[in-house]
Structure formats: structure tokens, C-alpha cells
């Protein structure tokens, strides 16, 4: 056997295990055993999750369990389980808290301010029967075939409501999430959180920097450190609000002042609400860059069905990363720009499919 034949034989022997491994994965991927595919992907080591809305990444069972546990801190929650027609005609059906929205969660203080008729529409979260508890959990899942973008954007956070204003509950959902990620081999996560004020059990305001300290304390716990998952945060603004520019100024400064915890600014909210168009924020960002250096931008864009140039306009804002980017393929010039460029698109497999 000459040298070339020996070399060929050597490489065949060397590569056989890799070929066999590739065939093995292809067999699982293309087969009918979906459980085997899920199990394989679950235990496969992973780098990181760069696009994660913390309050949108909590299983309903976790929300229920952790919300009840907050009684130890003095928090009590109620949820709306029936409609008794307590209000007259002419209410705002498009408000953040529409009267007809079931399973909206409120604090004990909010409950105390209701009249007797509306109090009868609510039950303590701890007192739900099995049917109500199941419906409560389904209310924050996309579990019906007709549920999609509208259900998600118009009811999910509106229902969570008071639960998202508790900074300790936020920290405990973080720990639950990190534990789940550690179990499937994740090593890094970036969570998107808001910068609104939080509240204590007596209704006292807990400012954002105090909430950051609560997150720091949670991450410093030994059992959390031992998980081996690094967590950082982006501060997000709701881009279509009338005061979105002021929100942007605030979170930009907070990210600059808390580099140990915060790594960037994001803009979220329905992109099909045209009041949040990207170019709206260009003057504000130019102003902010003159005051603060090194603040990174990772911004939702291209999360709509219609062809448009929102991804390009978002890159113009200075974003390094694009969230979703679903309609990027309809913008040929920007596709060419990004083909060899330094930009990253965060592909969100589940939400891109469902929303």
C-alpha cells in the first residue's frame, strides 16, 4: 500500500466515528420519535440564550407557586374569576386593564379599593378551586388554536399585572429559570426586564436600583452560583408609548451606571403599532451618545408580516443585534449588508412561529 492509500485509509478510520455520529443525529431528527429528538436537544450543551423576556419565560405553574409563597413577605394576590356586570356601558375596552379581562391579578391593596360588586368578581389566588386554577394557568399560555399575536400582546402582561411589580417575585422567577437552563446545559442568558418602579406589600415604592440589588442578591446565592449559568440583563422600553423617548433616556443612563448587571438597552412592543417606528428614536440616541459611552443596543425589529425596512432603520440606530428579524428576507439591500457584517439576528423559533 503506497503512502497516499495509507493516508486515505487513515482519514477514513479517523472520520468514521464522526460520520456515524452525524448519521445517528440525522436518524433521530428525521424519525418519528419526537421524544427522542427532544431529549437529544435538551441534553445537548448550549452556549447562551440572548433573547429572553424574563416575565414571559416563566411557566404558569411557577408563577402560581411563587406568587403564593410571597405571602411570607406580606404580599397577597387576587384574580378575576367572573363578570358580574358591575360597570355601566361606555368603559374603555382597549385600556391596559379592560373590565372584561378575566384572570387579571391584583394586589390586596388594589382589591381593597374595589366596590363590593367588583370584589365579588375576584378570588384570592390561594382559594382557587381546581377548575379555576387550571383556567388561571391557561390564561397565561397560548393553549388554544386561535390564540396568537393578539392574545399574547394584549393579555399576557395585562393579566400578570401586580405579579410583575414585586421585585422579590421577579428574582425568584429568575432563579427558577436559571435552574431549568442549567439542567439543559445552558451557560449564559441575557434577560430583558423593565425599569418601572416596583412595590412592596404595603404599596410603598421600591425604585429600580433597589430591584437591581435584589437581583444581585439572588445571583450571589451559593446554590445559584453553583448552577454555572451566567446571567446579565437588558433594560427594555415599550417603544410605542407617548413618553418612550423619556423612558429611553432613563434606561440608557441606568445601563451606563450598572455595567456589572446590565449589558444593553432594548425596545419592545408590538411592531405593527406604527407609533414605535425605529427612526423615531434616532435624535434621542444621538443625544444620549454624547453623554454616555459604551451602551450597547439590542433591539426588536422585523417582527411583522409586512415587508418593510425596520431592520435597516434599527441598524441605523446603532443596534449590534436584531431581535426576531423575521421580515429581513424581504429587504434585499439590508440582507446584502448583513451577509458579511458584524450584526447578529436573534432567531426566536417559538415566538416567530406563533406570533
Question: What does each model-found stretch correspond to?
Answer:
Residues 1-8:
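Bacterial N-terminal signal peptides that target proteins for export
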Residues 8-10, 350:
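Short amphipathic alpha-helical "recognition" segments used for binding
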Residues 11-15:
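Cleavable N-terminal signal peptides of Sec/SRP-targeted secreted and luminal proteins
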Residues 16-20:
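N-terminal signal peptide c-region/cleavage motif recognized by signal peptidases
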Residues 22-297, 303-344, 349-355:
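Metal-cofactor-binding active-site regions of metalloenzymes
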Amino acid at each position: 500500500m503506497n503512502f497516499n492509500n495509507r493516508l486515505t485509509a487513515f482519514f477514513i478510520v479517523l472520520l468514521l466515528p464522526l460520520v456515524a455520529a452525524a448519521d445517528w443525529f440525522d436518524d433521530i431528527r428525521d424519525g418519528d420519535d419526537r421524544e427522542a429528538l427532544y431529549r437529544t436537544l435538551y441534553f445537548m450543551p448550549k452556549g447562551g440564550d440572548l433573547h429572553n423576556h424574563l416575565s414571559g419565560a416563566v411557566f404558569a405553574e411557577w408563577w402560581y407557586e411563587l406568587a403564593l409563597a410571597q405571602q411570607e413577605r406580606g404580599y397577597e394576590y387576587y384574580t378575576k374569576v367572573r363578570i358580574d356586570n358591575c360597570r355601566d356601558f361606555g368603559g374603555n375596552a382597549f385600556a391596559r386593564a379592560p373590565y372584561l379581562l378575566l384572570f387579571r391579578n391584583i394586589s390586596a391593596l388594589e382589591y381593597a379599593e374595589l366596590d363590593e360588586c367588583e370584589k365579588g368578581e375576584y378570588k384570592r389566588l390561594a382559594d382557587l378551586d381546581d377548575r379555576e386554577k387550571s383556567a388561571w394557568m391557561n390564561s397565561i399560555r397560548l393553549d388554544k388554536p386561535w390564540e396568537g399575536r393578539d392574545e399574547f400582546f394584549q393579555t399576557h402582561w395585562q393579566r400578570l399585572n401586580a405579579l410583575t411589580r414585586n421585585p422579590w417575585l421577579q428574582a425568584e422567577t429568575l432563579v427558577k429559570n436559571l435552574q431549568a437552563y442549567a439542567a439543559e446545559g445552558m451557560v449564559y442568558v441575557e434577560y430583558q426586564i423593565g425599569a418601572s418602579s416596583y412595590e412592596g406589600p404595603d404599596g410603598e415604592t421600591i425604585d429600580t436600583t433597589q430591584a437591581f440589588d435584589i437581583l444581585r442578591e439572588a445571583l450571589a446565592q451559593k446554590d445559584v452560583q453553583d448552577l454555572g449559568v451566567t446571567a446579565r440583563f437588558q433594560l427594555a422600553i415599550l417603544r410605542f408609548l407617548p413618553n418612550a423617548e423619556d423612558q429611553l433616556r432613563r434606561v440608557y443612563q441606568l445601563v451606563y451606571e450598572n455595567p456589572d448587571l446590565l449589558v444593553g438597552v432594548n425596545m419592545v412592543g408590538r411592531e405593527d403599532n406604527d407609533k414605535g417606528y425605529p427612526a423615531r428614536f434616532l435624535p434621542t440616541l444621538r443625544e444620549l451618545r454624547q453623554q454616555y459611552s459604551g451602551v450597547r443596543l439590542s433591539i426588536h425589529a422585523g417582527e411583522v408580516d409586512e415587508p418593510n425596512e425596520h431592520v435597516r432603520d434599527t441598524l441605523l440606530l446603532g443596534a449590534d443585534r436584531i431581535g426576531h428579524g423575521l421580515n429581513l428576507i424581504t429587504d434585499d439591500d439590508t440582507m446584502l449588508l448583513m451577509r458579511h457584517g458584524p450584526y447578529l439576528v436573534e432567531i426566536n423559533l417559538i415566538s416567530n412561529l406563533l406570533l
